[in-house]
Amino acid sequence: ESTKKAARCFYALSQNRADRKRYPAVDPIDSYSKYLEYPEIAEYLNAKVDPQWVEKVNKAKNYILRGKEAYEQINILGDDGVPMEYHNRYWKSELIDFIILQQDAFDAIDSSTPMDRQEFMLNKVLEVCDAPVDFESFEDCSAHYKNIINIMRQMNYSEYKSADFEKYLEQLNTVTRHDN
C-alpha cells in the first residue's frame, strides 16, 4: 500500500494468474501507471500513437474491471443466476486479457509487439467489445468469444500484415459481421 503513494508505476505479480498460465502474471487490476495521468505523457501518446490512445487504454482497463466484477457475480450466483449481460461483460474482459495482456515469451513474434501492431490489435479488440451482440444463452456467448479469441491468438502468432495475418483478420471480420 505504501508503494502506491511513492511509485509512479507498479506491476503487481499474481500467483492466481501464474497458476492459470496467464503470462506475464501481472494483475491488470492491481497494477497501475500514473504516467497516463500526466498531461505531457498523454499528449505525447495521443500524438505519436493515436489521438485517443489514452482514452482507449482506459476503456480497455474498464472492460477488465467490469469483467472481474461480473466473474465474481457469476461464481456466486451461477451461470443461470445472472443476466446475460454479466456473461457478455466477463467474456469481453477475457478477450482483452487473452489478446492484449497475455504474451507468449517463447514465440518469436508474440514475444515482442511493435507499437503499430499493438495499436491495430487494441483497436480490433475494442471494435469487437463495442459491437452490439445478443445471445440466447451463456453457452452461445462463451462460444462466440472463444471463437474470436482463438482467431485473434492466431493473429498474435502471425507476422503483422502477412498473408496468414490477413487470412485470420478476414476470418475475424466474417465472424463479427455474421454475429452482428
Give residue spans per PLM region.
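C-terminal accessory/interaction regions of large nucleic acid-associated machines
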Residues: 171-180
